[in-house]
């Protein structure tokens, strides 16, 4: 599972996801990519599940790049706890994804293999996505 080695602060505000992604919205490494169409928090488990699905489907050959990293801690309160007494402890990590953001890239395979692998990875994501080709 992906997570930062160390952070400056243990806990973060939840924040808002306004507008579209201006960074990381162009294909940089591969030829094919999976692009987000909705805003969401994508957990490190979901990122890993998508990566595994793509790797398994592409078999040998082809390279996969994960273009998002979960750097936001999400805190959870214990069950049946009364209000107050501070913020919960960090439970898992999420990547903040805005519309237009590239999630995964793929290269070194034919289009139909890439399309199939990326469609399987997109089914692991909690948002609507689209398959795009560079050029």
Swiss-Prot record:
GO terms for molecular function: rRNA binding; structural constituent of ribosome. It comes from Daucus carota. GO terms for biological process: mitochondrial translation. Its main location: plastid. It is found in: Plastid, Chloroplast. InterPro entries: Ribosomal_uL16, Ribosomal_uL16_bact-type, Ribosomal_uL16_CS, Ribosomal_uL16_dom, Ribosomal_uL16_sf. Part of the 50S ribosomal subunit. The gene is rpl16. HAMAP family: Ribosomal_uL16. This is Large ribosomal subunit protein uL16c.
């Amino acid at each position: 599972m992906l997570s930062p080695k160390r952070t400056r602060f243990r806990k973060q505000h939840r924040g808002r996801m306004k507008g579209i992604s201006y960074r990381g919205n162009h294909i940089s490494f591969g030829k094919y990519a999976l692009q987000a169409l909705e805003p969401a928090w994508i957990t490190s488990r979901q990122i890993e599940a998508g990566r595994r699905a793509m790797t398994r489907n592409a078999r040998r050959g082809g390279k996969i790049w994960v273009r998002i990293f979960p750097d936001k801690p999400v805190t959870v309160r214990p069950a049946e706890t009364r209000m107050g007494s501070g913020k919960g402890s960090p439970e898992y990590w999420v990547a903040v994804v805005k519309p237009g953001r590239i999630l995964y890239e793929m290269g070194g395979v034919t289009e139909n293999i890439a399309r199939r692998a990326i469609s399987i990875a997109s089914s692991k994501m909690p948002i609507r996505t689209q398959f795009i080709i560079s050029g």
